Structure formats: structure tokens, C-alpha cells
């Protein structure tokens, strides 16, 4: 790196598996620091690293998303869900997004969702009303507690990527692989703890090519961390919460 280079850090477990997120300075492995070739300002850039890496990796590295795909984004109002909708819409996909709150429907449509379903835990029949043969791809952000239902939304040869655990259930002891995965369909997953330069470069190229702007809900100063957490835990944020250091 050179002086004045714009760089980002992507640490995966920072703030969860280990401390270090709320500091003015942090010592990081060089493999977790990346050059950011972008015109985004620092507030926008702060919303990119892990969220875009997770969404992009899930869509293009795992689901092999293409322009003619139909995709269900289950957990559409999560930070990763919002970015996934933006990325999928940028290449021309048809998108079904889910939310638990009716007041989020218009927001999801504004960022690119073609259809929005209120998620009560069982949505497969509602998805089949829109796509009788099922969708070609599913991004599962809610988790293992609804994966059986999400599998039922897949078309033949469809792929489901398990990325999120918004439902707080990491593992399922009742998951019957043979019975749950439809014949000719595929289950994969994405884990964000292994960032690499190739994908990060692709992400910034994609952002520039399609003029994608990160959706920012609110910006706080570092002294307002508690307020940022309260907003996050209220589930009322529409987009990323950014903290200025």
C-alpha cells in the first residue's frame, strides 16, 4: 500500500468472535486489508466490506446468479438482504423478498424487489402462487429454522444458499438431508471469514459498473455506540448503521 491509498478491513469475526471493532486504531493481518478502488465517500465505504462481501459471495460464488434467474431473498430487510436485492436487480433478476413487517414492503420495492411476502414462518405456498414451478435461486438469511420451507420454493435444478442465521438457530438436529432437499436441487452455504482480494476487486468493479449506492439508515459518532445498538436492536433501521471513528 502507498500513502493516501483508500483501504478497507474485512475481519469476519471482529466484534463477535473477538474484540476490536470499536477502536480508533486496530492491528490487523495484511491478508484482511484490501485496496478499495472506489469513488464512494467514507460513510458509504464504511457500509461495504463485510455486507457486500457476504451478499456478493453468496449470489455469485455460491448461487451462480444470472440475469434470467428468479431469486427469493428470505430476510430481505437485513443488511445482507438489502445488498443482495440491489446486486440481483442490477443484473436483471426477478426478486421475491420477505419481511415480517408490512411497513417494510414499500422500502423493499424501492430498492428493487419485484414481489414482497410477509414472512410468518411458512411462505412456500405464497412463493408458488407467484412462480408455480418455483424460483431458480434462494438466498436463505433467516436460517435453519425455516430452511425446510425455503427448500419447497425451489424449481428443479434450483440452488439454495444458507448464509444467515437471523432466526438465531445455528444448527438443526431435525434436518433430514435426503427428505428435505428436493430431487435435482442443491444446498450450499457461504461463510464470510475467508475474504480475498479477487472477490473484493469484483465487488468494487460491480459497484462502479452498476452505480450501486449502499443504503445507509443512520450515521452515528463513536461516542454514540449505545444509540447505534439501540437502533439496530429495534429492527427499525432500513439499511446499514454507520459509526464514524
Which residues make up each language-model segment?
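Short, glycine/polar-rich helix-capping loops at beta-to-alpha or helix-loop-helix junctions
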Residues: 22, 100-107, 171-176
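A glycine-/small-residue-rich N-terminal strand-loop-strand element
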Residues: 1-13
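C-terminal hydrophobic helical "lid"/dimerization subdomain
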Residues: 196-245
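Short amphipathic alpha-helix with an adjacent loop that forms part of the alpha/beta core around
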Residues: 122-133
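Mid-domain Rossmann-like dinucleotide-binding core that forms the NAD(H)/NADP(H) cofactor-binding site
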Residues: 6, 47-121
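Glycine-rich phosphate-binding loop and adjacent beta-alpha segment
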Residues: 11-13, 145-212, 245
Amino acid at each position: 500500500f502507498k500513502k493516501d491509498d483508500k483501504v478497507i478491513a474485512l475481519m469476519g469475526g471482529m466484534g463477535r468472535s473477538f474484540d476490536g471493532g470499536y477502536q480508533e486504531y486496530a492491528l490487523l493481518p495484511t491478508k484482511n486489508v484490501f485496496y478499495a478502488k472506489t469513488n464512494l465517500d467514507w460513510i458509504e465505504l464504511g457500509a461495504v466490506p463485510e455486507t457486500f462481501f457476504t451478499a456478493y459471495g453468496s449470489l455469485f460464488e455460491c448461487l451462480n446468479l444470472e440475469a434470467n434467474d428468479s431469486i427469493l431473498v428470505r430476510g430481505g430487510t437485513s443488511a445482507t438482504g438489502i445488498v443482495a436485492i440491489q446486486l440481483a436487480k442490477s443484473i436483471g433478476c426477478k426478486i421475491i423478498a420477505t419481511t415480517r413487517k408490512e411497513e417494510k414492503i414499500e422500502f423493499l420495492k424501492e430498492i428493487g424487489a419485484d414481489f414482497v411476502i410477509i414472512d410468518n414462518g411458512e411462505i412456500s405456498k405464497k412463493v408458488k402462487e407467484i412462480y408455480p414451478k418455483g424460483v431458480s435461486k434462494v438466498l436463505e438469511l433467516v436460517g435453519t429454522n425455516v430452511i425446510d420451507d425455503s427448500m419447497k420454493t425451489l424449481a428443479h435444478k434450483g440452488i439454495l444458499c444458507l448464509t444467515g442465521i437471523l432466526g438465531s438457530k445455528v444448527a438443526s438436529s431435525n434436518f433430514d438431508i435426503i427428505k428435505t432437499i428436493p430431487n435435482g436441487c442443491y444446498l450450499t452455504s457461504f461463510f464470510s471469514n475467508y475474504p480475498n482480494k479477487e472477490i473484493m476487486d469484483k465487488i468494487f468493479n460491480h459497484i462502479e459498473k452498476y452505480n450501486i449506492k449502499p443504503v445507509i439508515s443512520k450515521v452515528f459518532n463513536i461516542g454514540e455506540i449505545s444509540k447505534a445498538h439501540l437502533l439496530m436492536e429495534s429492527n427499525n433501521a432500513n439499511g446499514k448503521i454507520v459509526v464514524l471513528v
